[in-house]
Amino acid sequence: MARKGTRIEAVMSEIRSRIASRAVVPGVRLPSVRAQAEALRVSVSTVVEAYERLVAEGLLTSRPGSGFYVAGPVAPLALAEMGPKVDRAVDPLWVSRQSLESDARVLKPGCGWLPASWMYEAGVRRALRSLARADTVELAEYATPQGHPGLRQFLARRLATAGIDASPEQVLLTESGTQAIDLVCRFLLEPGDTVLVDDPCYFNFHALLKAHRVHVVGVPNTPQGPDLDAFDAALAAHAPRLYITNSGIHNPTGAVLSPLVAHRLLKLADRAGLVIVEDDIFADFETSPAPRLAAFDGLSRVIQIGSFSKTVSASLRCGYIAAKPAWTDGLTDLKIATNFGGGRLGAEVVLSAITDSGYRKHMETVRVRLTEAMDQAVHRLATLGITPWIVPQAGMFLWCRLPDGADAAAVARACLQDGVVLAPGNAFSQSASAGDYLRFNVAQSREARIFEVLAKALSTAERG
């Protein structure tokens, strides 16, 4: 059984999350200590102590004889302050900023993209030269509401090769994969709704869902997909509206969804009326196709999203949503309301690049390089006592456990001082249960200095 201090902190974390997501708003009375204790299956004294500590933090007010109430409002979009107080080193926003703001001298084994030299630069340059000769409409006009017709037709054909039957009219282009998820959240969610995510999952899911002020529940992940018993229990306990996942190459673990888990997952989702968002941005890194929930479901309750930032260029902001027609229509209206016409140039360049005769060969080369980099990273990490959760079939990520329960956040802070940006496990974990894990990007982990700095940080952590 967990220590009482841990139980108190868990109650506080749950209440902070509800306040941050606007599931409970300023002025609302919280459940009585007895009712809260029964709901959370803890003692009354644990809830009393948690409530009193939250009063001391200024999140609650106590009214003698009446109960405990939510205090003043959460500042609009103060994302770093929303939710439980966490070490800044495991805050998803902080981790993203360290990777995005660092200069070329900083090594980034914790980032989520390929080195610039691995991207399809030659194809992008050819596309830009071709576009420079295009007529004025291509260079100056807004895109149509759903986006470039040619790119949507291409995506419909590509989806068909994955077993997903979608017409071009069911495809909506967006400015990025992140915008695609943001639009879906705006379309389907209200503040206070519950969303399921994998635990661990891509850390920007946490940041984005904070912005939508929803209640997030993590479901433990396995090498074959989500733990279905835990998933079923979460459906019963929380009545979630949405589940966001990667079914191809999972971020951060590199795991692949098994067909058996996919079928059982969809049955559970159908019974609960759950909508699934399938983030498929790593599809081009696969060496053999993984099952797709959207293929099994036929885009009935599954929405698939993707982008081209991982393989073509991160500077070309272009993604997509594939959904059933009624939803695509509503999402298109929402895109106009929030983004108006969208970009045309990016879609033109992306289409030209990915239909270029060299793109397929380029990706074959990238997949080979990733396999070599994966083998090298596993070997180098093993010399430091760092072990992978699994060795993935494909992709760029290794989800690794540090030796002797070392604190990944402390190791990341130490490495940052020496110009190495890492991604600590709890940035990915809704339950904060990955404190001794790091995610490594093998394509960004080829420099020997990374492992020298990491060895030094681990040694310091052991002495500490």
Provide a role label for each language-model segment:
Residues 73-75, 308, 323-327, 356, ...:
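Short loop segments at secondary-structure junctions
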Residues 138-272, 284-299, 303, 461-463:
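Conserved core of the PLP fold type I
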Residues 1-130, 332, 336-342, 372, ...:
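N-terminal basic, amphipathic alpha-helical segments
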Residues 37, 42, 323, 399-405, ...:
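Conserved PLP-binding active-site segment of the aspartate aminotransferase-like
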Residues 124, 298-368:
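Conserved core segment of the aminotransferase class I/II
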Residues 368-378, 388-401:
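Conserved glycine-rich beta-strand-loop-beta hairpin in the small C-terminal domain of fold type I
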Residues 197, 218, 276-278, 422-424:
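Hydrophobic residues in well-ordered beta-strands that form the structural core
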